[in-house]
Amino acid sequence: MAAACRRVPLNGYSPLVIIRPAIPAERDALEALQLRASLVNEGDREALLRHPDAIDLPMEQITAGAVFVVEQHGAVVGFSAIVAREDGDTELDALFVEPGTQRQGVGKRLVEHCAKVARSKGSTCLHVVGNPHAEQFYLACGFSIIGRFDTRFGPGLLMRLPL
């Protein structure tokens, strides 16, 4: 994967941002961002506080170039991670946006970037295990629900985006 950065406008109004691969030195800061973003959702807060081990960004994903950050004004405001699936498709394994920059297009740009990377690797679909609180976001990004199941945090959605 090329380490080149892409500059993209958010929502046509926001300043330019950079989407780039994460670096190992950012791991702790990204996990802290994940926690802040996760605690915004009151429906997940109690379960997350009972299971702090859920906040984990494997270093292997970062060193493999599978974690992407969005920088705005030099600050990281969101990140995503992808993993290869056994069926040849790609899983969106993480998607977190700073609470103060949510609903500004950061998450959508990360999904679009991950879809582009997955397509370049030969995947035909991008999959995600979605939280019901994020259902409308993923549907707006083009995902469809292909199943439902229970997780240790409550209900989960299996979703797929054709590439």
What are these regions (language model features)?
Residues 105-107:
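Conserved G/P- and acidic residue-centered "switch" motifs that form tight phosphate/ATP-binding loops
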Residues 34, 141-142:
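Short, flexible helix/strand-to-coil boundary loops that buttress conserved ligand/catalytic motifs
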Residues 102:
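Glycine-rich ATP-binding loop(s) of histidine-kinase-like ATPases
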Residues 21-94, 98-99, 111-113, 117, ...:
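Acetyl-CoA-dependent GNAT
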Residues 2-25, 163:
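Conserved N-terminal entry element of GNAT/NAT acetyltransferase domains
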Residues 18, 91, 125-127:
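Residues at or immediately flanking beta-strands
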Residues 124, 128-136, 141, 147-163:
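C-terminal "cap" of GNAT-fold acetyltransferases
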